[in-house]
């Protein structure tokens, strides 16, 4: 099996009132909560994440990244399997399961990318939360394999959760859930160029 970068997006919405309350209650920091990932459910990219694979990876992520306050994520789709500290915008501070939904609490950082993320939220922009990992997929035999459904394999490794502008799953706004595969598309190139200009 050939491992590739897998990116799965869920919409993440938060009201202006909730943003203001969060900033007030958290000493000026924006802290948001919602769905980070969903197990055993086909996303808009046609991928299904088996619960046992996500349980294992989330457990490792909690024990290392979250507990050590290094569960950093980036703003937009990175083209790398590592988190670039120059682009860090937020830190996942807590995660837990509610059935097949992985819920989490995310602190927006006071970094250049974090400040952009905070202003996007304050302006009412809908963003997606995106899981990033390395792994392989295998076709699932639904409708004779014609629908393109694939299942993420046990070699999956969770890398990070990133905020993105193009959620590919219904409800992936840190309340609902969404996902997508990392492909070099014209949309990704345009977003990368715009972000490069914004970051200077």
Model regions and ranges:
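Polar/acidic, low-complexity leader/linker segments enriched in S/T/G and N/D
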Residues: 1-64, 182-192, 199
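Extracellular-facing segments of soluble proteins and assemblies that are Gly/Ser/Thr-biased and enriched
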Residues: 84-88
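Short, flexible beta-strand-to-coil junctions
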Residues: 36-42, 76-79, 132-138
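Short, solvent-exposed loop/turn motifs
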Residues: 48, 81-82, 149-150
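Short conserved beta-strand and strand-loop elements enriched in small hydrophobics
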Residues: 60-83, 129
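A broad, low-specificity signal for short, low-complexity segments enriched in glycine/proline
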Residues: 53-67, 89-95, 120-121
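Residue microenvironments linked to proteolytic maturation
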Residues: 8-11, 15, 23, 31-34, ...
């Amino acid at each position: 099996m050939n491992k590739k970068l897998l990116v799965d997006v869920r919409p993440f919405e938060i009201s202006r009132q909730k943003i203001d309350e969060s900033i007030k209650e958290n000493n000026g920091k924006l802290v948001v909560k919602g769905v980070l990932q969903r197990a055993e459910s086909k996303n808009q990219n046609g991928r299904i994440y088996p619960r046992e694979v996500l349980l294992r990876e989330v457990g490792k992520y909690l024990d290392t990244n979250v507990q050590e306050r290094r569960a950093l994520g980036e703003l937009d789709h990175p083209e790398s399997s590592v988190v670039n500290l120059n682009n860090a915008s937020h830190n996942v501070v807590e995660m837990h399961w509610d059935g097949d939904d992985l819920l989490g609490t995310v602190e927006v950082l006071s970094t250049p990318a974090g400040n952009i993320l905070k202003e996007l939220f304050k302006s009412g922009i809908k963003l997606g939360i995106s899981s990033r990992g390395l792994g392989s997929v295998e076709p699932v035999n639904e409708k004779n394999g014609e629908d393109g459904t694939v299942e993420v394999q046990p070699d999956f490794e969770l890398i990070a959760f990133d905020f993105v502008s193009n959620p590919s799953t219904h409800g992936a706004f840190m309340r609902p859930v969404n996902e997508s595969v990392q492909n070099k598309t014209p949309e990704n190139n345009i977003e990368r160029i715009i972000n490069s200009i914004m970051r200077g």
